[in-house]
């Protein structure tokens, strides 16, 4: 398992779920790649209780993480509080100063175009934050 690439680890996590959560996270993953073909996948926070870790999508910093719970799939945006979210996709972690999240329950859906726009906005924010200070 340690010789696997991050993308292979994410593939294994999705395959191992084998239910609606895996299908939902796979769809969100595809939308992230559609929105930003240069996105890099990584896996963070691997531990005994979660050996495949948490999928992370990055471009000039973390865009979002994909967490799986019994009753939902959660996409947490690292700098979500700084994003406009004109379509109101954020529905969790709304009180924090930094992060925002989208919880998708079984049978739930997401507006694909609005989600891709949110991904592109997060990438643009990361790129501005990475510019050297003068």
Feature locations, PLM:
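Charge-dense, helix-prone N-terminal extensions
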Residues: 1-134
